[in-house]
């Protein structure tokens, strides 16, 4: 077994205090997202999306956050993908934003709700044309005999859609994750990290500090 126990670091970028917290967690998330973008982090919108299958086996993958507001967090995917199939059976999911250079992370527990075709189309039309074509090509999570099969289909579809707009595939969609709780983690000195969790109580958010 490879021993990694000597890899460690100190966290000294500053703490997080109760007095600094807004009542709405999405306000704090918006601030932290802005700061992550201003710091020019690599893929600041990247988040880990966790789902479970019908046997309770968890799966995780990195997906890009495309929109957020007070209602929740939006991402898009192939509706035939493993994540979409698992959401159809159990829409409870978790999201995780790992902003390591800022010594921060955000964890979200919530329920995924399918977006309307109108909402999906509105976003789909903003994608680069090659990305739109790629959505038609990949049967996400299915097995491939070789990469050449995927590339061949891409160029076939690229020729097919050479003129005009690329239509929205019926098997491509998106989700709004409505948060039930949002935890903010800020690294602290001596491993005394600051953790605050917002838990939804009807129309209000309850704020609690958690032990590190």
UniProtKB/Swiss-Prot annotation:
Catalytic activity: pyridoxamine 5'-phosphate + O2 + H2O = pyridoxal 5'-phosphate + H2O2 + NH4(+); pyridoxine 5'-phosphate + O2 = pyridoxal 5'-phosphate + H2O2
Cofactor note as given: Binds 1 FMN per subunit.
EC id: 1.4.3.5
Keyword annotations of the record: Flavoprotein, FMN, Oxidoreductase, Pyridoxine biosynthesis
Domain of life: Bacteria
InterPro entries named in the record: Pyridox_Oxase, Pyridox_Oxase_CS, Pyridox_Oxase_N, Pyridoxamine_oxidase_dimer_C, Split_barrel_FMN-bd
One Gene Ontology term of the molecular function aspect: pyridoxamine phosphate oxidase activity
Transmembrane segments: none
Protein's job: Catalyzes the oxidation of either pyridoxine 5'-phosphate (PNP) or pyridoxamine 5'-phosphate (PMP) into pyridoxal 5'-phosphate (PLP).
Protein name as catalogued: Pyridoxine/pyridoxamine 5'-phosphate oxidase
Species name: Shewanella sp. (strain W3-18-1)
Lineage of producing organism: Bacteria, Pseudomonadati, Pseudomonadota, Gammaproteobacteria, Alteromonadales
């Amino acid at each position: 077994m490879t021993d990694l126990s000597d890899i460690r670091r100190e966290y000294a970028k500053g703490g997080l205090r109760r007095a600094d917290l807004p009542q709405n967690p999405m306000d704090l998330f918006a601030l932290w997202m802005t700061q992550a973008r201003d710091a020019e982090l690599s893929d600041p919108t990247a988040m880990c999306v966790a789902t479970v299958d019908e046997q309770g086996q968890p799966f995780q993958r990195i997906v890009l956050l495309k929109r957020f507001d007070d209602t929740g967090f939006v991402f898009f995917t192939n509706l035939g993908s493993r994540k979409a199939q698992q959401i159809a059976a159990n829409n409870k999911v978790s999201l995780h934003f790992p902003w390591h250079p800022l010594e921060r992370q955000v964890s979200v527990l919530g329920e995924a709700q399918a977006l309307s075709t109108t909402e999906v189309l509105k976003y789909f039309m903003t994608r680069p044309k090659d990305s739109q074509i790629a959505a038609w090509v990949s049967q996400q999570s299915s097995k491939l005999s070789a990469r050449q099969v995927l590339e061949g289909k891409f160029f076939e579809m690229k020729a097919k859609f050479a003129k005009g707009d690329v239509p929205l595939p019926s098997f491509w969609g998106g989700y709004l994750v409505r948060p039930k709780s949002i935890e903010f983690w800020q690294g602290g000195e001596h491993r005394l990290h600051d953790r605050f969790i917002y838990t939804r109580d009807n129309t209000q958010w309850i704020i609690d500090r958690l032990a590190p």
